[in-house]
Amino acid sequence: MATKSNEENIAEFKGHNEIQIELMKEECIVVDNDDKPIRPGSKKETHLMVNINNGLLHRAFSIFLFNGEGKLLLQQRALEKITFPGYWTNTVCSHPLWIVGSELVEENAQGVKIAAKRKLNHELGVPLDQVNIDDFTFMTKIHYKSESKEDPQWGEHEIDHILIMQKDGITINAEPNEVMDYKYVSQEELDQLFKDEDEGKVKVTPWFRLIALNHLKPWWNNLNNLKPLVEPTNTIHRY
């Protein structure tokens, strides 16, 4: 017989993929409004709208990987994903974990960069030896909240650290439970993707759209000279 906690899990996860359910046990970093770590919180706890609507906030990161031609790598989230399944989004968007001395390290955004390398490998199969922590440039942070329309008991409420990397020779072997498709796009092709979304032809994650429409173009146009555009780590854009 299922315990009470198991019964609750069955109700919340009904119809969802077992691998994705298991990942909901990961310990994210619960933060305050200024992105200061408070405590660990499971991926499940931090993504339930009942908690989000009570103010629960966690740390995240978004990777924007460009190739040598200046094209941006996008992924389409697998249908197995619990939040925003089938949506197009930036290269990788995920969460650093509550790991002291590693993904919790604040200096130079070291912790989120360690997490970013881990998730490039997990989601897109990028070999660990093809990515160095120093390949990532931290740009800024955004604070946003969004409900997952497909299953509105789930959502996001994050302070999202934006990381940019430009590199050729990246091997991609996408994990099908995470990623159903991927492609490199030009600025014009990304503009078309948003037009297609407006016409109901595709779905795009809300955080990617926010970042792309409010911040991305100056970075994209200055990939060879990002340093002047890097913002202080205490800068948080609220949406």
From Swiss-Prot:
EC number(s) from the headed UniProt entry: 5.3.3.2
Assigned GO CC terms: cytoplasm
Pathway(s): Isoprenoid biosynthesis; dimethylallyl diphosphate biosynthesis; dimethylallyl diphosphate from isopentenyl diphosphate: step 1/1
Sites where the protein binds Mg(2+): 47, 58, 156, 158
First-tier enzyme category under EC: isomerase
Annotated keywords: Isomerase, Isoprene biosynthesis, Lipid biosynthesis, Lipid metabolism, Magnesium, Metal-binding, Steroid biosynthesis, Steroid metabolism, Sterol biosynthesis, Sterol metabolism
Claim: Ribonucleoprotein is one of the keywords in the record: no
NCBIfam families, per the entry: IPP_isom_1
Summary of the function given for this chain in its UniProt record: Catalyzes the 1,3-allylic rearrangement of the homoallylic substrate isopentenyl (IPP) to its highly electrophilic allylic isomer, dimethylallyl diphosphate (DMAPP).
Similarity-based family: Belongs to the IPP isomerase type 1 family.
Protein name per its UniProtKB record: Isopentenyl-diphosphate Delta-isomerase
Record organism: Dictyostelium discoideum
Name of encoding gene: ipi
